[in-house]
Design a protein with these regions (language model features):
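Non-catalytic signal-transmission and effector/linker regions of two-component phosphorelay proteins
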Residues: 1-7, 108-144
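Short amphipathic alpha-helix used as the core "switch/output" element in two-component signaling
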Residues: 43, 65-78
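Active-site beta3 strand of CheY-like receiver
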Residues: 48-54
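Acidic catalytic/metal-coordinating carboxylates
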Residues: 36-40, 51, 63-69
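Active-site residues of response regulator receiver
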Residues: 56, 86
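Charged docking surfaces used in two-component/phosphorelay signaling
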Residues: 19-27
Length: 144
């Protein structure tokens, strides 16, 4: 069933790339929504509530790094893992980005990376859902 693995917002100005990423993720069980630039991403992110966002670096209106900046300053989206997908990807991961995927990429590499980030985000959400006292000190009982 779509979405069992996670929800991904794919942001790229190329319809071909959006479709390529979407199809590969959907084949692996992800629910996918697409946006053609950073502005559309910011409009869609609250409606769709993705577990991971993939972002192209060079897009019209609002590029990938400016979109990253806006997502990171919004408390509602600050913790969503972000993958920068770009033909001109730098070897190091820019501040605010969780991973970089260079174009062209292997579909298995994309799916594996997104899956790992979804799992990490879910573990973090489970951890944060625990009461603060439980996170700080595991329960300690004295044996009778």
């Amino acid at each position: 069933m779509p979405g069992d693995v996670g929800r991904v917002l794919v942001v790229d100005d190329s319809q071909v790339i959006r479709q390529l990423i979407k199809v590969n993720l959907e084949l692996d069980g992800f629910e996918v929504m697409t946006a053609s630039d950073g502005e559309e991403c910011l409009e869609a992110v609250h409606r769709f509530a993705p577990d991971v966002i993939t972002l192209d670096l060079a897009m019209p209106r609002l590029d990938g790094m400016r979109t990253v900046g806006r997502l990171r300053v919004d408390a509602r989206t600050a913790q969503i893992p972000l993958v920068l997908v770009s033909a001109s990807a730098a070897p190091e991961v820019p501040v605010g980005v969780d991973a970089v995927l260079a174009k062209p990429f292997e579909p298995a590499e994309l799916v594996g990376l997104v899956r790992a980030l979804c799992e990490r985000a879910r573990k973090r959400a489970v951890h944060l859902a625990k009461p603060l006292a439980e996170r700080r000190c595991p329960s300690r009982t004295l044996a009778p």
